[in-house]
Design a protein with these regions (language model features):
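Short alpha-helical
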Residues: 8, 30, 52-53, 124
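A structural motif shared across PLP-dependent enzymes of the aminotransferase-like
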Residues: 1-8, 71, 167
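PLP-dependent aminotransferase-like
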Residues: 34-94
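Short loop-beta-helix segment that forms the pyridoxal 5′-phosphate
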Residues: 12-35, 43-49
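Active-site region of PLP-dependent enzymes
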Residues: 89-91, 99-196
Length: 196
């Protein structure tokens, strides 16, 4: 299967959300991680009620974690321009000049089992994040033929997942998504792992 299907999926998703660019990744949390690494972030602000993998990034990346009481809907800001939009599914909802991370995990509206996408503004950001997701390389050139200049993290979406996304996309666009509420997640600050 060709990696061209990933580009097609990225283009259709960016068009749906109204974003100039979209970088397909293996999961939403890894998309957020790539954005934090790319922007060299030293602190994230995380709602007490969200999915647990987001605050775990602070430990993984050795950055500061600040909890916030926030009743959020569809998305929230980790930094001034990095957004966890894991549950967002609304046309033309991209917020300009941000990095929005959307999930395609099996419980999400476009349920692919696993997967995510980073919505972004510029070609420069797209290329940098794409390379980071592909072991530091350009996906269109065999890696042995490249002088790789940046670290990468092997977080790319597989062509099979992208094809599944294309196959399910029209139905996802036609159907109303679940409206998640903040109490769908527990208060993470009460968990032992965050009291250490």
């Amino acid at each position: 299967m060709s990696f061209e299907v990933i580009k097609e999926f990225e283009n259709k998703i960016s068009s749906f959300f109204g974003a100039p660019y979209a970088v397909a990744v293996d999961c939403c949390t890894h998309g957020g991680e790539l954005c934090l690494r790319y922007k060299n972030i030293k602190k994230i602000e995380v709602p007490k009620r969200t999915y647990i993998s987001i605050p775990f990034l602070a430990n993984k990346l050795n950055i500061d974690l600040e909890w916030k009481d926030e009743v959020w809907t569809n998305y929230y800001y980790l930094t001034n321009d990095i957004i966890d939009a894991a549950v967002l599914w609304r046309p033309n909802s991209y917020i300009p000049k941000t990095f929005m991370n959307v999930s395609f995990q099996f419980k999400k509206h476009l349920a692919l089992g696993r997967g995510g996408i980073i919505l972004c503004d510029t070609k420069e950001d797209y290329i940098a994040l794409k390379k980071m997701s592909y072991d530091g390389r350009h996906p269109d050139i065999p890696w042995r033929e490249q002088d790789i200049e940046t670290y990468g993290y092997h977080y790319y979406m597989t062509p099979e997942t992208a094809q599944k996304g294309l196959d399910k996309l029209s139905d996802a666009i036609k159907t109303t998504p679940k409206q998640w509420i903040v109490t769908d997640w527990p208060d993470l600050t009460q968990m032992k792992v965050f009291k250490k």
